[in-house]
Every structure is written in structure tokens, then in C-alpha cells.
């Protein structure tokens, strides 16, 4: 006995292969610090720093803990986590995610292993996106939004509800572990802004009117009877039977020197039985804090959107395609797509700076700064 009040003893498995070691023992006067020291020792002993991708860590090497805590003052011993029951969650999940955040930033003059790799991969993706734009341009795509940059004005969490052993998730590149915003999400929020602009212009307010407008925009065929704004929306974003002419690219971050990328947040559901077991909500239930990983405020993302000129030309050659829609395509061509570029920039900017993207936007997450700049 070394005189410290709390003793944590047990094993930690990182993943289902290897990384299993003899019992680890940690002592401290504070239970929380004893747990943190226990996990630090397990991390160092396992040589887990050889894993350079957060995605790989989350997919294959989430820690499984089998340990007990002894209170030498009260002479009591309790199970912290057990292989026979829950083996990660609560404070162990927080300790694990804190370690991920720690390894994703500078400590003193030393960069964490994840920080080095994410910064390196962000440079690679900057090059890959540039090459992707060039290749698409050679395939008759017009660049409508060219590497425009917006900075997060609040925490960002895309993919929070995706399946994950940690209960919550964050969209990361499946190989390189770099956070990004999927193109499908960007297209969705831009389309949403365009939709509500049309609804406002047409003075559609009731639920029934909104539902009919949705059907007209997403289910009905492109027709000469459609108004100009509705035709533009269908041409750009598509319908059930027509592929839209806009192409959104995934948005990747531009990591600055010494910039922290991630930080933890917590949500605290108060009625666990109501949400998970269909029970009546009651004040007698204990709050259930859930720690989750987010992209930090102040991270710059780069956005790119292109227009399919090849298919637009085919539309103009199609004798059966509605003439009113052809006229819109011709007008875009005549002004060099400048009007189209302005519309797309406005939709995306309004979506990201006013409504947000990802999870928990009603609570202010996923909002970007108003300033758009270009490389």
C-alpha cells in the first residue's frame, strides 16, 4: 500500500486482438485521477500510438475495461467495469475520448500523433480535391463554387446518430480519420434553402400547401406548366426521375499550424426510460450524461460545387424536353453561369450560416461564420 486512498486494478483490451496485458494498478487520492492514470498506463503499455487513424481506432480498437476500484479509507471495493457486464461507458468513455482529443492537438511543443496525421491528410485532400475539380472540368463540368471557405462559428457534429459502439458518432474519413462534411449533406441543406425560398415567393404557408409543393418539386416530372423558380430547382437538384445538374463535393477542413481540431461536449437526457423503454417521463429518473466528440469552433472547411455542362447540352438537343426548361439552361450559358454561381453561393451560405448543418442545429451546432473567402 502506498498511502493513496483509491486503487484501480485491472486489464484493458484495445480491440479483439492483442493489446492484452497483465494487470495494471494505479493509485491516487482522487478516484477520477486514479482512473485517468490507470487508462494512461494502459494506453502506454499497449503501444496504441502506432495507430495513426482515429477511424481505425474507433472501428477496431475501442478499449474494453475489466477493472475494480478499492477505497482503502472506507475499506470498500466496487466493480468499475466488467467483461460480464458493461465494459465501456460513462466516465471510461469520457477518459478515452479525452485521450483522442489530447492526441489531436499540440502539447507544449509536441504535436499529438493524430494531429500530425490529420494535418498531413488535410494537405493531401486539398490536392485531391483540386485534381478532382480539374478532372471534372475536363469532362465538361463547370466550376460554380471554387474552393470557397467558411469557418465554423460553433461546434460541428455530422453523423452523431450513426451506429457506433460508443453510442454517438462523428463522420470521419473511413481510412484517414479526417473529419469532413459529406456532399449529400451539403446538397440537402442547399436544396432546403432553395425550397423555402420558393415556398415564401408563392406564399405557401399551410401544411397542405407545403406538402403539395414538396410533391411538385420532388415527385412530378419537369413540365412547361412549372414556374421559373420551380424549373430551376428541378433542373439543379433533380426529381425522382431526373438527376440534378449540380454536383457537390465533400468538404474537408483546412488545418492551421498548432490548431486544435476536436473537443468534447456532453448532452444529458433526463428521461432515459421514456426515450429507451417507452415509459412515462418522471423527475425521479437520474440524468444520463453522454459525452461525444465534436469538431471545434474556428475550423475552416472548403466548399466546391460544379455544374454538368455535358448533360445540359443534351437537354438542349432533346426535342421532347420542355422548352421553358431549355430557356433557363440557355440563359445560364449566355451569362457564363454567373447568375447560377451567385444563386448556389447564396443557398449554401444561407444554409450554413443561418440554419447550420449536421446534428443539434436547433441548439446552435453546425453554424458557420458569415465571411466567405476564396483561396
Regions found by a protein language model. Give the residues of each.
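Basic, Gly/Ser/Thr-rich N-terminal segments that form RNA-phosphate-binding interfaces in CRISPR RAMP
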Residues: 1-375
Amino acid at each position: 500500500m502506498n498511502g493513496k486512498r483509491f486503487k484501480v486494478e485491472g486489464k484493458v483490451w484495445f480491440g479483439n486482438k492483442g493489446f492484452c496485458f497483465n494487470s495494471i494498478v494505479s493509485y491516487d487520492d482522487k478516484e477520477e485521477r486514479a482512473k485517468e492514470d490507470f487508462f494512461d498506463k494502459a494506453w502506454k503499455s499497449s503501444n496504441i500510438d502506432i495507430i495513426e487513424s482515429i477511424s481505425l481506432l474507433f472501428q477496431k480498437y475501442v478499449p474494453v475495461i475489466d477493472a475494480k476500484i478499492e477505497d482503502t479509507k472506507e475499506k470498500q471495493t466496487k466493480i468499475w467495469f466488467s467483461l460480464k457486464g458493461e465494459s465501456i461507458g460513462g466516465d471510461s468513455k469520457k477518459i478515452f475520448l479525452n485521450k483522442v482529443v489530447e492526441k489531436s492537438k499540440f502539447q507544449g511543443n509536441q504535436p499529438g500523433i493524430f494531429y500530425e496525421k490529420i494535418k498531413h491528410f488535410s494537405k493531401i485532400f486539398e490536392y485531391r480535391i483540386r485534381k478532382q475539380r480539374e478532372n471534372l472540368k475536363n469532362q465538361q463540368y463547370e466550376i460554380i463554387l471554387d474552393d470557397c471557405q467558411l469557418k465554423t462559428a460553433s461546434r460541428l457534429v455530422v453523423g452523431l446518430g450513426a451506429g457506433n459502439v460508443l453510442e454517438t458518432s462523428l463522420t470521419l474519413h473511413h481510412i484517414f480519420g479526417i473529419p469532413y462534411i459529406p456532399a449529400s449533406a451539403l446538397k440537402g441543406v442547399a436544396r432546403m434553402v432553395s425550397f423555402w425560398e420558393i415556398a415564401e415567393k408563392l406564399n405557401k404557408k399551410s401544411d397542405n400547401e407545403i406538402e403539395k409543393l414538396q410533391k411538385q418539386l420532388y415527385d412530378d416530372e419537369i413540365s412547361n406548366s412549372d414556374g421559373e423558380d420551380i424549373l430551376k430547382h428541378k433542373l439543379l437538384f433533380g426529381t425522382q426521375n431526373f438527376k440534378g445538374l449540380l454536383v457537390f463535393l465533400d468538404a474537408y477542413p483546412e488545418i492551421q499550424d498548432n490548431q486544435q481540431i476536436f473537443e468534447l461536449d456532453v448532452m444529458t437526457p433526463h428521461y432515459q426510460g421514456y426515450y429507451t423503454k417507452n415509459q412515462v417521463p418522471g423527475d425521479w429518473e437520474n440524468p444520463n450524461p453522454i459525452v461525444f466528440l465534436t469538431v471545434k469552433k474556428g475550423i475552416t472547411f472548403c466548399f466546391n460545387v460544379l455544374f454538368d455542362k455535358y448533360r445540359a447540352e443534351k437537354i438542349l438537343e432533346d426535342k421532347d424536353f420542355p422548352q421553358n426548361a431549355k430557356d433557363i439552361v440557355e440563359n445560364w450559358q449566355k451569362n457564363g453561369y454567373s447568375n447560377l454561381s451567385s444563386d448556389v453561393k447564396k443557398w449554401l451560405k444561407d444554409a450554413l450560416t443561418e440554419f447550420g448543418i449536421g446534428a443539434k442545429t436547433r441548439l446552435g451546432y453546425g453554424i458557420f461564420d458569415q465571411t466567405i473567402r476564396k483561396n
